[in-house]
């Protein structure tokens, strides 16, 4: 972890850093297990080139998921948006890996069902966020089909076409799909709390 990030994390947590260990598994951010001088262990994500809104909106999303008290969601301990020349980072409680219990899949299923059933204010969210490094519009829509079509599928198709990754015919093909989406997805469900 870069020295300026270590200093900023230590200042945000009120404790010096004793050690850092880079973790693997992600492709967008750098991830570290960090032991503090006060013996706490935390998880730190960094990304020097990230959009300044990326980590703050992730922190908002994690807090929103936590309010349902349905599944274990890491608590946000500190966040920096890279303003004022401070490095961008997100500090979460460290959850130690363990072998799953024999009924883990069942417990996870029940927890996710409880999370989804805890509801949401509508089909959308009160703030925009990111899918990877791509900005994601979460403005409310009248139905789930409209939200999924207009806020998820359409922007990704447009981006793929604009970047030359997909042929321009996709615009028309997916446009046709989006007009039929309400019929394809079936009966309307109430808004759910999704990650």
Predicted regions and their residues:
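Alpha-helical structural context
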Residues: 11-12, 68, 184
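Juxta-kinase regulatory segment immediately upstream of eukaryotic protein kinase catalytic domains
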Residues: 1-19
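Generic structural marker for isolated residues within well-ordered, non-membrane alpha-helices
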Residues: 5-6, 62, 178
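ATP-binding pocket architecture of kinase catalytic cores
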Residues: 21-146, 150
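Short beta-strand or tight-loop elements
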Residues: 16, 27, 72, 190-192
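Active-site catalytic-loop/activation-segment of kinase and kinase-like phosphoryl-transfer enzymes
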Residues: 131-182
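Active-site acidic catalytic loop and adjacent metal/ATP-binding pocket
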Residues: 30-35, 76, 172-195
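Residues at helix-coil transition
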Residues: 117-120, 158, 186
């Amino acid at each position: 972890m870069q020295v300026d990030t270590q200093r900023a994390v230590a200042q945000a947590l009120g404790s010096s850093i004793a050690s850092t260990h880079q973790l693997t598994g992600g492709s967008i951010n750098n991830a570290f297990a960090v032991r503090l001088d006060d013996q706490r262990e935390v998880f730190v994500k960094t990304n020097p080139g990230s959009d300044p809104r990326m980590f703050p909106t992730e922190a908002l999303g994690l807090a929103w998921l936590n309010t349902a008290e349905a599944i274990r969601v890491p608590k946000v301990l500190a966040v920096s948006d890279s303003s004022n020349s401070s490095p961008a980072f997100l500090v979460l409680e460290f959850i130690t890996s363990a072998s799953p219990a024999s009924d883990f899949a069942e417990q996870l299923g029940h927890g996710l069902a409880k999370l989804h059933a805890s509801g949401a204010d509508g089909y959308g969210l009160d703030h925009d966020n990111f899918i990877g490094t791509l900005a994601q519009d979460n403005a409310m829509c009248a139905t789930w089909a409209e939200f999924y079509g207009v806020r998820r599928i359409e922007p990704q198709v447009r981006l793929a076409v604009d970047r030359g990754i997909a042929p321009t015919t996709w615009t028309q093909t997916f446009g046709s799909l989006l007009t039929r989406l309400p019929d394809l997805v079936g009966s309307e469900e109430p808004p759910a709390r999704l990650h």
